[in-house]
Amino acid sequence: MNSQLQNNDKMIRTRFAPSPTGFLHIGGARTALFNWLLARRHGGAFLLRIEDTDRARSNPAAVEAILDGLSWMGLDWDGEPVSQFERADRHVEIAHELLARGHAFKCYCTAEETQLLRDEAFAAGRALRSPWRDRDASEARADTPFTIRFKAPDSDVVIEDAVQGQVRWAAKEFDDLILLRSDGTPTYNLAVVVDDHDMEITHIVRGDDHLVNAGRQSQIYDAMEWQRPVFAHVPLIHGQDGKKLSKRHGALGAEAYRDMGYLPEGLRNYLLRLGWSHGDQELFSDADAVAAFDLAGLNKAPARMDLDKLNHINGYHLAQASDDRLCELVTPFLDSLENRIEDINLTTARLKAAMPTLKTRAATLEELADQSYFLLRQRPIQLEGKAAKPLKDDETRQRLYRLFTHLGDLKAWNEAALSDALKQFAEAESVGFGKIGQPLRAALTGGAPAPDLALVMTFIGRDETLDRIKDQMTPATTE
């Protein structure tokens, strides 16, 4: 049976459990995606838990940022998000049950004694073991502060991981894990196990930086006689240079990719392929991804962030998106364009006319806005630098005047008619097409990125085309 199903055939329940200390990091977004896909593939549940036990670092604004990031990415969760902090009483209850079962003990070591023990253990090449694991608590004074520690195992610890295979640690590698601090608050590894058990999580997919934690947590599962979940520890994302992912590699929050103009489906597709494979297939719709995803496809080697590939994949999804949706999504990005028309209805009309072409020429919404600029430029278009050079001499401007007359006489105004008209005019003038195309493009676009000239004129219409040409039939613009 596939390892992802080996959990007594229970309904698959996965979870994403971020700490609310910042935005939805790109690595966390991938973890959430993998868990979401696994649950959706098998008709299970994808749950959300906020691990907010570190009150000093937990930030309500970060919680909102994480929820917003997941929502924007289209990763819907089942039920209400669970607050780990609010479950502290339950964590304490299990710590005392472990104490009663003989799997935990009260440790009365002071901070100074603990540090000394830690130094001695390090020098001996083993993890810390508290002397109180073999002493009776009655030996301590009644008012002495204590922690509750889990008794580290005396034999090797072994887990079966769906990605890493069998992982084994020698007993000496594990210390007597603190379950409850001296102030009575639970620690991470205890809280995680209790929450995952109570939430009936069957599969834990997370970064391999938690692999050692899985070794620790598996001991608590066994001590409580709880069934272990299926573990799947995925290698972390690296930069293109193979080094740990950082901001210079693209280690940003999901909202940063949104603000750069990536589509959620494009980012989902890219993150899916960042550490998971399904043959040679690279492009996935959501339905394709849900149908294909399994733990067997997760790679054991670290994936490398590749912004060029992200742009390629996002460009594909941009081209597949509906024109109406893109017209709406690109609107905020138009604010960066200078000297553009402000008529909203005219802007929308031109965008809708051109969108089937423009969306095949851009990788992001930001690029789509740049590709749209020629449509929206305010007349008269100011020509500067290279854009002005094709219109520097009188002969060119006189030819532009004749072209103005030629185009004005056209009966039909569509791509085919305009393309034929330009060719006929070049033949009549006995010049190469470049002698016509370059100055015409300068007059119509001002040097902004634009498709074929016949399409440009079709998109902006007869009146705007002739007006833009007329604006440049004046003494040559200087730099």
From Swiss-Prot:
Localization, UniProt: Cytoplasm
GO BP: glutamyl-tRNA aminoacylation
Motif ('HIGH' region): 18-28
GO molecular function: ATP binding; glutamate-tRNA ligase activity; tRNA binding; zinc ion binding
Residues given in the record as ATP binding sites: 247
InterPro entries, per database record: aa-tRNA-synth_I_cd-bd, aa-tRNA-synth_I_codon-bd_sub2, aa-tRNA-synth_I_CS, aa_tRNA-synth_I_cd-bd_sf, Glu-tRNA-ligase_bac/mito, Glu/Gln-tRNA-synth, Glu/Gln-tRNA-synth_Ib_cat-dom, GluQ/Sye
Motif, 'KMSKS' region: chain positions: 244-248
Catalysis: reaction(s): tRNA(Glu) + L-glutamate + ATP = L-glutamyl-tRNA(Glu) + AMP + diphosphate
Chief site of localization: cytoplasm
Keyword Cytoplasm: yes
One annotated Gene Ontology cellular component of this protein: cytosol
Claim: Aminoacyl-tRNA synthetase is one of the keywords in the record: yes
Entry EC no(s): 6.1.1.17
Keywords from the UniProt entry: Aminoacyl-tRNA synthetase, ATP-binding, Cytoplasm, Ligase, Nucleotide-binding, Protein biosynthesis
Alphabetized NCBIfam families for the sequence: gltX_bact (TIGR00464)
Function: Catalyzes the attachment of glutamate to tRNA(Glu) in a two-step reaction: glutamate is first activated by ATP to form Glu-AMP and then transferred to the acceptor end of tRNA(Glu).
Protein family: Belongs to the class-I aminoacyl-tRNA synthetase family. Glutamate--tRNA ligase type 1 subfamily.
Subunit field text: Monomer.
Protein name (database record): Glutamate--tRNA ligase 2
